[in-house]
Design a protein with these regions (language model features):
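Intrinsic-disorder-associated, low-complexity terminal segments enriched in Asp/Asn/His/Tyr and depleted
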Residues: 8-11, 18-21, 34, 43, ...
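M16 family metallopeptidases and their MPP-like homologs
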Residues: 125-135, 161-209, 216-227, 254-279, ...
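His/Glu-rich zincin catalytic helix
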Residues: 74-163, 187-194, 201-204, 250, ...
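Intrinsic disorder/low-complexity segments enriched in small, polar and charged residues
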Residues: 3, 12-16, 36, 51, ...
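Low-complexity, intrinsically disordered tandem-repeat tracts enriched in small/polar residues
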Residues: 16-18, 23-25, 30, 35, ...
Length: 828
């Protein structure tokens, strides 16, 4: 194909109840198929012929149909690892963690008190993560600013930005740092042994010996400073984190989520903004900044995580010799306190900014949130993930559908929010009105009471459990290293209870117990206890307000002007001088001597043998099947790619709607809710999406593909093909009510997502005028697409027939055998 660029655009695979991507699966099927819905007599679209054709495409080799094959998650590790020679550490716990196929160790460094977790297996993508509990006392953003600042040079690597140089000679697979509401982490990953050691060295030096004590300019650059280039200029605030958080506070969803935290947990670190509130960031002093590091960035407050195939004993010895042995154990008061339960539900309003051209009508967020326990009980946590699926996330979910049917807002979101000491569950409606608040709460209560009284659909529960178990066993995190995600998972218990470090890696028992107890009223009891009879809850409304940004900026300008007026000429000149010195610091070049200290990989450190990827093309019935032979732990990954070159220009944006409709409307034999549950109950999901490839002619050519992706165990292959056929050939595209619901949801989500990623949206739009790839992206996922969705939703009654006709045209143009390219990945 000559493809040099692959853009996977809004692929809606059913990856489950993640807060940013909800999608799931479907129901049992009958063999009797009537496909006149779309084919109108076209032989190419007869599903019977398609069944035979698809089967033939995938029968080009012998297949292992062993029904007893077990889906294994993670990387297998058969041999036990022995940690016997590390006298500097006390081994507190050792166990075989079968759920993730690893040997787990929990250690404590004797001299410094550092906690250390080892997960040893054969994964060559090694991960190191050092985590500190960093509970903020206010919203000055000190934890966030410190996360930026420690990476601006250290004792052994005194560059202004050592990581710019480091990545030039690194093969890292992950290199970053993250601030959470109660912790800060510094993870790295690499498949190369020497590279991994280099990364560990730079990160350990950064967190324990940063240059922040010698160079105040780092704090001023990364946090905040007064900017005054000339005495007569207006005084301004500036700083990396300050500007970053100004952007974050302009996002409606971030403003709302932040307020929910603040209202639910007013007496804990979750009640303030760890990232920093722009109004509060300038209150942070350099002295308090340094004190925060001195208090929390000590080995006694650290949680060190090592994962993968490495010489663990050697790494432990290195950490002891180079860093941990330099510190004595101290007591660090960083324990996260629990919020005292409320006696009654609290209510609060928060305003978020909208543009002058945006409407304040039908733009309110209604939310109801409940604290549902703590994160230490893995079975309970998993049960709430299932309830997320059952109540809200799955299409047709009863609480979601009840709110939509009541005409409250245009989209429903929310779900289970974990990753903190006290997880909570939120029901959120977008594009609503303030006057709908009481109706919103009434519908929630009536729907939940009905579910408790009549019982939850057991098929929905089974689908939710199977989906979550499939995802856990598969442990596929896309481009993120598996060990990185495990290091985040263990923090959900380890940081709050030293005796429960591995509980979120051992979930299979919880899944088994939930399957057994699902029919005994477990989930109904949880709803009654935590959602109906729980006073520790909050109703938070997010209200749009025009001119809010201008209003806030004016207040800031007036505050700065008043402060400037209070300064003497001499003080103003000092500010000018500090501004000049900061710019001089930023513009100065690191010395060659300093750059030379950054560890770089040598050729001898890199193996000569590249990782062999076996891609074997097969030509069957006139189509190409590309087989990838990889270790998939018994899972088949199948992608059907349909070339869309026959699609006329005026229909391109409608492809974005089509991929949002397929699988989310009724078919010949199922409601969309039934389909969704059945697919999740028996596979890893089916999803539709659009991909674009840069062609050989880099300037004027691109290849556009409509994809159908799925993953399943081999014994479920026939079922999966039947479900794909059900979706592609019997989808009901004439259900006006459902089409309008989907358009409304699309509009609400696009309004939030495009605004939240404004820079990316603008870049895509600008590039669309000269790049075919960007033009396609914009028309199916950007501003061009939003304009179509907005127009169709606004004038639905007038344009619904055009919409339905165009969707049917696309079905006929795209899903033709001659357009098909198959990619299949198996370990056989």
């Amino acid at each position: 194909m000559g493809a040099v660029k692959n853009e996977d655009i809004s692929y809606r695979g059913r990856r489950g109840p993640d807060r940013k991507d909800r999608s799931y699966a479907r129901r049992s099927y009958a063999r009797k198929i009537h496909c006149r819905t779309l084919s109108d007599g076209c032989d190419l679209l007869q599903p019977g012929a398609w069944d035979e054709r698809i089967y033939r495409l995938l029968q080009w080799k012998e297949r292992d149909t062993e029904t007893g094959r077990k889906l294994a998650g993670g990387v297998r590790w058969e041999a036990g690892m022995q940690i016997t020679d590390c006298s500097a550490y006390e081994i507190l716990q050792k166990e075989r963690i079968e759920d993730v196929h690893a040997d787990g160790y929990l250690l404590r460094h004797k001299k410094s008190g550092a906690r250390v977790m080892l997960l040893a297996n054969q994964d060559e993508n090694k991960v190191f993560n050092i985590i500190f509990r960093t509970p903020p006392a206010d919203s000055t953003g000190v934890a966030h600013i410190l996360e930026h600042s420690v990476l601006c040079g250290s004792r052994e690597f005194p560059l202004k930005d050592p990581f710019v140089e480091l990545v030039k000679g690194s093969l890292n697979t992950f290199l970053n740092a993250m601030t959470y509401p109660d912790k800060t982490m510094y993870p790295v990953a690499s498949c190369n042994d020497q590279d991994f050691k280099n990364l560990m060295h730079v990160y350990m030096d950064a967190v324990f010996y940063p240059n922040i004590y010698e160079k105040e300019e780092i704090f001023r650059q990364e946090g905040w400073h007064y900017q005054l280039e000339q005495v007569d200029d207006p005084l301004k605030y500036n700083g990396v984190v300050y500007n970053e958080m100004k952007g974050a506070f302009s996002s409606s969803e971030e403003v709302l989520e932040r307020e929910i935290f603040n209202v639910l947990f007013p007496d804990t670190p979750y009640g303030v903004e760890s990232g920093g509130d722009p109004k509060c960031i300038p209150d942070l002093t350099y002295e308090n900044f340094l004190a925060f590091h001195g208090k929390y960035y000590h080995p006694s407050n650290s949680y060190i995580f090592l994962y993968g195939n490495m010489d663990m004993a050697e790494r432990l010895e290195w950490m002891d010799k180079e860093y941990l042995s330099k510190f004595d154990k101290i007591t660090v008061d960083s324990q996260i306190a629990k919020q005292k339960p409320f006696e009654k539900t609290v209510e609060h309003k928060i305003f978020y900014p909208v543009g002058e051209n945006d409407s304040e009508e039908e733009n309110t967020y209604l939310t109801y949130s409940m604290v549902v326990g703590d994160g230490l009980d893995v079975k309970r946590c998993t049960a709430f993930e299932v309830l997320d699926y059952v109540l809200l996330s799955a299409p047709g979910a009863p609480l979601r559908q009840a709110l939509l049917d009541a005409g409250i807002g245009k989209d429903v979101d929310g779900g289970y929010n974990d990753g903190i000491y006290q997880p909570f569950f939120t029901v959120e409606v977008k594009s609503a009105e303030e006057k709908d608040k009481e109706k919103f709460l009434q519908v929630i209560r009536e729907t939940l009471e009905k579910l408790v009284k009549e019982g939850i659909d057991q098929k929905a529960i089974a689908a939710g459990i199977n989906y979550l178990e499939f995802r856990f066993r598969e442990s596929d995190y896309g481009s993120y290293p598996r060990g990185l995600m495990y290091s985040i998972d263990v923090c959900e218990s380890w940081l709050y209870d030293d005796n429960k470090p591995f509980v979120h890696l051992e979930k299979l028992k919880a899944f088994d117990e939930l399957k057994k107890e699902a029919g005994e009223g477990l989930f109904e009891q949880l709803i009654q206890e935590t959602m109906l009879d729980n006073p520790h809850s909050a109703v938070v409304l997010g209200m749009p307000k025009k001119g809010l940004t201008t209003e806030e900026e004016k207040k800031t300008e007036e505050k700065l002007a008043a402060y400037k007026a209070s300064l003497s000429r001499e003080q103003l000149e000092k500010l000018v001088e500090k501004t000049r010195k900061l710019k001089e610091f930023q513009d100065s070049e690191d010395s060659a001597e300093a750059k030379a200290k950054i560890p770089m990989l040598k050729r001898s450190d890199i193996g000569k043998e590249a990782l062999k990827i076996h891609n074997t093309p097969h030509h069957v019935t006139g189509n190409t099947v590309l087989h990838h032979n990889l270790d998939t732990n018994g899972i088949t990954y199948l992608t059907l790619l349909f070339d869309t070159k026959q699609v006329q220009d005026e229909l391109i944006s409608y492809m974005g709607i089509l991929k949002s409709v397929l699988g989310y409307v009724d078919t010949a034999h199922f409601t969309y809710g039934e389909l969704f549950h059945e697919i999740n109950a028996q596979s890893g999901g089916i999803g539709c999406g659009l991909q674009v490839f840069q062609g050989k002619d880099q300037k004027n050519d691109c290849i556009r593909m409509f994809g159908v992706k799925t993953k399943y165990l081999v014994q479920k292959e026939e079922f999966v093909f039947s479900m794909i056929r059900e979706i592609l050939f019997t989808s009901r595209l004439d259900d006006d009510k459902r089409l309008y619901e989907i358009l409304s949801q699309q509009k609400a989500r696009l309004q939030s997502s495009l605004a939240a990623a404004g820079h990316s949206t603008a870049v895509m739009r600008a590039a669309s005028y000269y790049s075919p790839v960007s033009n396609f992206q914009d028309r199916i996922a950007g501003i061009g697409y939003f304009r179509l969705v907005e127009e169709l939703e606004k004038h639905f009654e007038e344009k619904k027939e055009i919409l339905k006709e165009n969707l049917k045209k696309l079905m006929l143009l795209i899903f033709r055998p001659e357009n098909l390219f198959v990619s299949v990945t198996t370990d056989e």
